[in-house]
Amino acid sequence: MKRSAGSALAARQQLQNRMGYLFIGPWLICFLSFTAIPFVASFALSFTDYNMLSAPVFVGLANYIRMFTKDRLFMTALTVTFKFVLLAIPLRLCFALVVAMILKRDSKAVPFYRVIYYLPSILGGSVAVSVMWRYVFSKTGVLNTALNALGIMSNISWISNKDTALWSLVLLFIWQFGSPMLIFLSGLKQIPASYYEAAECDGAGKPRQFFAITLPLLSPIIFFNLVMQMIGGFMVFSQAMIITDGGPMNKTLVYALYLYRQSFGYYKMGYGSAMAWILLLIIGVFTLLVFKSSSAWVFYENQIK
């Protein structure tokens, strides 16, 4: 009896193990096929000269050396991307926080506005929205029409002007503030109302409450949003490709767009792979810097004095 019970238990355990492997199998296959193997392959290709038509030729560090010594457009793309990140990320986070604080109020219309404000985050990366944005900022677009109606004469093409083209991409990025806004809103609702009541009793006004209570207690959420938005900012691609295609005069040639051109425009897969690894390194360094600095500005509830 004991042996049969033990055998049945072992058989059941074995069946559960097999079912576990069966359920994890599709994820594992996808992970290996679309993440792990391409990850390793791109690292290997970064040391080769490969154009997809012939076998890869090992060139050592030649791709990396060329990037920093001979390719002027590489440095241009890097500069444009840094400028984009420095402009777009703080503005998007500030705008998202302001809207989140407005939507924190109890109102029957708040759920409706949450959906409306979140829609750009879903639609903003689509081709249709990018084409619409291109029309809005064109010479005969909606923006110039509105400015002319207000008596401000404007007939410039915002996306073709080297001084304003990057700002058109920045504004589109800011417009997609729904995701960080919802995260901020969730964090704001976790702050106890008793803190604000105590501050009011002490005579603290709204600005003082914001800087002494809201901002410190929201700093972990700000930290999370900053990291996620920074990573997304460094990888911005589709909007730049569809709206400006890197122009005018490479003023909107972001890093990911230049990487795409090298890899799939000029078929320099080895060079493109090397660029991808440099981008990964840049994102890793900046993420590490944010993590290292977090001890100085990220506070938790038990640290607030």
Can you describe what each PLM-predicted range is?
Residues 1-15:
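Short, Lys/Arg-rich, polar N-terminal cytosolic tail immediately upstream
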Residues 15-305:
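A structural signal for multi-pass alpha-helical bundles of membrane permease subunits
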